């Protein structure tokens, strides 16, 4: 049985329409900063709690800094405290490789000190520390530090770099690259879900651990991402702005999750470009500029 909780802040109820009437699915509409939702959650019998609730990304956190801290840290720790008292099997926190920030180390692993350059990164650092403190009190936890997300989904996000570049290339718009040398690891949304399932399937191995979730082969500079898209869509025009540089740059090792949980990703940036192309051709995305597809 699955219980889903969401505030539906982005008018995204349609993304669960296909499962809302399933007998083994229950939906709770609410914000994790609201005590009413906590009361509802506390009534449920829970084996595994997966905390995906967050104000995600640097721009979104910049627009709502107080809300970002409240959701990403305060409410997250409050939820974990509730789960500590419910004696669950596993609490999974969705974190981010953004905690590494601007880092000169060639390949970062889970032991590398975080150097976030944004509120989003800092809020996740604080959340991780809070979860680890509760772990010392008995909370069984796993933390997944996700690479940068991409991929077509029930509610595709076109404010994510790969998705945005794919959409722009497919609609004959320039790909604007700021600097372009900054490196990011990338992960498809389906592989993000897969990482969660691997933690649940291997609770004894996953418990008390932090995992970078992604694939070393998917560490790319932003310019490389643009060039991958141009390989698929040759008409793509890449515009580089050298005077605007993004300081966030890091390559990440994913050896731990591969070795400990036998986890490997299945999808690549090319899959996302092809999926977005197919969605546009099949008119599944009627208005790519709609606010439905953006968090900022």
Predicted features by range, described:
Residues 1-140, 145:
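N-terminal Rossmann-like NAD(P)+-binding domain of SDR-like oxidoreductases, especially those catalyzing
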Residues 14-17, 104-106, 154-157, 189-190, ...:
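Short aromatic-enriched loop/helix-cap "lid" or pocket-rim segments at secondary-structure transitions
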Residues 33, 99-100, 149-151, 192, ...:
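Conserved sequence/active-site signature of Rossmann-fold short-chain dehydrogenase/reductase
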Residues 34, 69, 151-155, 185, ...:
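Nucleotide-sugar-dependent glycosyltransferase donor-binding/catalytic pocket residues
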Residues 61, 147, 210-213:
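Short-chain dehydrogenase/reductase
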Residues 117-119, 129-184, 189-200, 227-232:
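NAD(P)-dependent short-chain dehydrogenase/reductase
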Residues 172-173, 177-296:
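C-terminal substrate-binding subdomain of Rossmann-fold SDR/epimerase-dehydratase oxidoreductases
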């Amino acid at each position: 049985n699955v219980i889903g909780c969401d505030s539906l802040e982005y008018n995204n109820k349609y993304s669960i329409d296909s499962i809302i009437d399933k007998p083994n699915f229950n939906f709770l509409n609410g914000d994790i900063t609201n005590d009413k939702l906590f009361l509802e959650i506390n009534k449920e019998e829970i084996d595994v709690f997966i905390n995906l609730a967050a104000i995600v990304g640097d721009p979104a956190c910049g627009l709502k800094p107080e809300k970002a801290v409240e959701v990403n840290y305060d409410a997250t720790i409050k939820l974990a405290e509730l789960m500590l008292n419910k004696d669950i099997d596993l609490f999974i926190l969705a974190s981010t490789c953004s905690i590494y920030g601007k880092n000169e180390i060639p390949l970062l692993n889970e032991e590398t000190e975080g150097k976030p350059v944004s509120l989003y990164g800092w809020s996740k650092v604080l959340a991780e520390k809070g979860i680890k403190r509760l772990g010392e009190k008995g909370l069984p936890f796993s933390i997944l530090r996700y690479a940068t997300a991409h991929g077509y989904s029930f509610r595709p996000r076109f404010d994510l770099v790969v998705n945005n570049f794919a959409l722009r290339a497919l609609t004959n718009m320039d790909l604007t690259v700021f600097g372009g040398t900054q490196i990011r690891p990338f992960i498809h949304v389906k592989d993000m879900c897969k990482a969660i399932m691997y933690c649940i399937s291997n609770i004894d191995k996953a418990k008390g651990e932090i995992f970078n979730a992604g694939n070393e082969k998917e560490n790319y500079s932003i310019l490389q991402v643009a060039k991958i898209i141009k390989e698929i869509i040759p008409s793509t025009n890449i515009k580089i702005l050298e005077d605007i540089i993004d300081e966030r740059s890091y390559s990440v090792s994913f050896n731990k999750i591969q070795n400990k949980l036998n986890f490997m990703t299945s999808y690549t940036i090319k899959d996302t470009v092809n999926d977005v192309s197919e969605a546009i051709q099949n008119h599944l995305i009627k208005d790519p500029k709609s606010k439905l597809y953006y968090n900022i």
